[in-house]
Every structure is written in structure tokens, then in C-alpha cells.
Amino acid sequence: MFQPLLDAYVESASIEKMASKSPPPLKIAVANWWGDEEIKEFKNSVLYFILSQRYTITLHQNPNEFSDLVFGNPLGSARKILSYQNAKRVFYTGENESPNFNLFDYAIGFDELDFNDRYLRMPLYYDRLHHKAESVNDTTAPYKLKDNSLYALKKPSHCFKEKHPNLCAVVNDESDPLKRGFASFVASNPNAPIRNAFYDALNSIEPVTGGGSVRNTLGYNVKNKNEFLSQYKFNLCFENTQGYGYVTEKIIDAYFSHTIPIYWGSPSVAKDFNPKSFVNVHDFKNFDEAIDYIKYLHTHKNAYLDMLYENPLNTLDGKAYFYQNLSFKKILAFFKTILENDTIYHDNPFIFCRDLNEPLVTIDDLRVNYDDLRVNYDDLRINYDDLRVNYDDLRINYDDLRVNYDDLRVNYDDLRINYDDLRVNYDDLRVNYERLLSKATPLLELSQNTTSKIYRKAYQKSLPLLRAIRRWVKKLGL
């Protein structure tokens, strides 16, 4: 149930109003970020949204220009960060990557680290909640924002229901959540063997509808993920890889879509979310046990509804909270400490015991090679799938032919036995025939001679009578 999660997030976003009407300036360099338009993507992030509540931000990508902070992540051209020597480098990731504090002064990530004031745990799901909160500032949305929240300040839109008719219906109790498809799956990265294996195992029990490029069953990729997910009782939301604390946006998408998440990725996910509100595959010894539990929920109405309507967050004294009390205040305090500290750790000669620049220069080359290998892998995978289909067809044909051969073999053996029996009978009859024929030949010869003699005597006896008849006929003139 997403509404309690939204309420808790909005509450975590509450901050005191600034005493001054003119926020201090903050120059931020974006070394590398997601997407082709890095500046634009950074402005869409929750980090920019939070910092803009306290600072007047100027963004740029010029290493020769002054920066209060420079942000970088392990994706894209990682070596760009090396060009920013005299600025405080902040690592931020949405992947299962740990920060290198020899290259970055500060870091924001998934790991549960304690590195004084240099690290903040802010999983990617917190950023996704920011986007969800923005999306429901809409008069037709089934989820409601508090009137005094930061997300309710802008003029609301009026198109949510038009784009999410099924989601609105199921959240507003206008349709039965039990009368939905079994499970959904949306993924674009095929290089996730655990996730793929679980999908195959679950799909063998009950069909799982795939709407992404991996294990797609629709014939096309869905464009509206949340509307798609809302049409199913469960959502298979495995992470690409496993890592303690590595909880991304996937579980948030399931909660938002009013479907039960089937989760795997962070073994410690129960610290972030209420274990009664989702299926945690890490809780089971193997896939079979997890699937048995999913089947139980699927077939037991009350158990399913209890989990569906659970608060996604853990509670303390009846109040929902984010793990480690994550909030806008905590994030702003983290950056306040950074800006007030003049130390640039990556430039400390005592930290550098080896040259770290040289290995980083090769990262881009390695990434190019990786992309090439990835393309080759995808091609090979397609060829493998085609060959597999052909093999399966040939196997089916072979099995059919084998069955036909076995049937013919049985029939042949039966016919052979019958033939052998008939042959024995034929030989016996032949012997009997020849024996009878040898005995009957003299009798036949005797019979023929006797018959001839009888006919001759009868003819001789009838001659006088025949002659008398002939004379009588002549007299009568006939």
C-alpha cells in the first residue's frame, strides 16, 4: 500500500523555512551523470531538488571553472572526475558500486558504511520516491499529498487517471485486486542469472507476463510500467546483482502500482522495508520454498490482502520511518558539513601511495570493450535461442519418430510371430497333403478305369433299344 509510504516520504521532506530570502550561491560541476544530457538529468534528481531548497545553484561542466562541489558516478566516462583537481569530489551511484575514497572526497551510496562525515547512505529508492511524489501532484491521482508539503507547491496536473486507469481503479477499490493476472516482470538487462533463473522457475508454475526486453511475453515493451504492473497481483522485482544495502527503485515501482513485490537483491532489505509487506526471497532456503509461499498467497485471499495493505515501512511506536532516519534534513546537514570543511582529501599526499590516475584512464577503453562484448554476447544469445528452438523442434520430431518406430517394431514382432506360426502350420499341411495325395492316386486311376467300363457296357446294352426307336421314327414319317 503506497499511501503510507508517500506520507512518510513527504514528512521526511519537510524542512524549516530559511530566515533569509536570498539563498547562498552554490556552484556545482557535473563531471559525469546518467543520460546524454547530463546537466538536465542532474536537475531532475532528488539531490538537485533538495539542495535547491537552500542554495541558488549554478551548474556547469568546465574543469577550469571554480566549483564548490563536483559530482561523478562510476558510469560513462569515469576519468572525467580526474580533471577536477581542486574541488570537493562527491561520488553518487545508482549501481551496486562502492566508493573509492582515494578518488572521491565524499560519497553517497547503498553501503552501510561509517566513515565519519564523508559518507551518507541514500539508496536509489529515495530518489524514485521523489519522482513518485512529483507525479501524484495531480487532481486525478489516487494518492494524495499533504497540502503544506514541498511537492504540493506547484500547480497540480489533471492527467494521472487518463494515463493510469487500471492503477486508479485498483487503488480506489473500483476493481478487485484479486481478479488480476498472476505476476509481472519488467527488465532490460539480461545479464542477471539469478533473476532469470527465478523467473523461469516461477513461470513454470504459473505464467509470468514479461513486459520488458528480457523474457518478454507480449511481443512489445511496455511504455507505462506502473500501469502495466497494476494489472497483476505480484511483481518480480529482483535487482541485477546482490549486495547488502543495494535497494533500488524496483520495489518502489511495485508498491506504487499496488502489487506485492517479490524481491531479491539486498539480504538486509528488511531494514529498509517492512518484511510483512513483500515476499523476501532471501528469507527462504531455496527458490522452491519461496515459490511455495507465493502460491500460498496467490490461493489464500486473506493472506494476500493482509500483505497487500501492509505499511511498506517499518514502524516505531506506531510511526513509520526510513532506515537510519533518512530525510531532507539529514541530507542537507551532510552537504553543509562538506561545504564548511575546506579539506580536499583526494589531494592529500599521505593518502596517495600509488598512482590512481593511470588505471582510471583505461576505464573508458574497458567500457568500450565491454559494450562490444555485450553486443557480441547478445548476438550469440539470439543465435543460441534460435538453435535452441530448432533443437527443441528436432527433439520433438525425434521423440515422435521414436514412438512411431517403437510401435512399428512391436507390430513387426507380432507379425513375425504370426508368420512363424503360419509357416509351421503350412509345413504340416504340406506334409499331410503329399501323404494324402500319394494314397489317393491309385484310387483315382481305378475310379477312372471303372467308370469307363460301366459307360461302355451301358451303351452296348442300350443299342437294340436305340435301333428300335430309330425304325419306329422312320415309319411314322417323322
UniProtKB/Swiss-Prot annotation:
Chain residue ranges for the region called May be involved in membrane binding: 434-478
Sequence repeat residue intervals: 364-370, 371-377, 378-384, 385-391, 392-398, 399-405, 406-412, 413-419, 420-426, 427-433
GO CC field: cytoplasm; membrane
Recorded consequence of changing N240A: Loss of 90% alpha-(1,3)-fucosyltransferase catalytic activity with an 18-fold increase in affinity for LacNAc
Gene3D superfamilies in alphabetical order: 1.20.5.400, Glycosyl transferase family 10, C-terminal domain
Pathway the protein acts in: Lipopolysaccharide biosynthesis; LPS oligosaccharide biosynthesis
Known outcome of mutating F352A: 75 percent reduction in alpha-(1,3)-fucosyltransferase activity
Positions of the record's site feature: Important for catalytic activity: E95
InterPro entries the record matches: Alpha-1_3/4-FUT_helico (IPR016646), FucT_N (IPR041058), Glyco_tran_10_C (IPR055270), Glyco_trans_10 (IPR001503), GT10-like_C_sf (IPR038577)
Predominant location category: membrane
Keyword hit for tRNA processing: no
Biological process per Gene Ontology, one example term: lipopolysaccharide biosynthetic process
Keywords attached to this entry: Cytoplasm, Glycosyltransferase, Lipopolysaccharide biosynthesis, Membrane, Repeat, Transferase
Membrane topology category: Peripheral membrane protein
Reported impact of F350 to Y/A: No effect on alpha-(1,3)-fucosyltransferase activity
Region (Important for acceptor specificity): 347-353
Binding site for substrate: 94, 186-189, 195, 222-225, 240, 246-250
Consequence the record notes for mutating E249 to A/D/Q: Loss of alpha-(1,3)-fucosyltransferase catalytic activity
Domain comment, as recorded: The tandem repeat region, which may form a leucine zipper structure, is essential for dimerization as well as for enzyme stability.
Record function comment: Involved in the biosynthesis of the Lewis X (LeX) trisaccharide of the lipopolysaccharide (LPS) O-antigen. Catalyzes the addition of fucose in alpha 1-3 linkage to Gal-beta-1-4-GlcNAc-beta-O-R (LacNAc-R) type II acceptor.
Similarity comment: family membership: Belongs to the glycosyltransferase 10 family.
UniProt name for this protein: Alpha-(1,3)-fucosyltransferase FucT
Organism: Helicobacter pylori
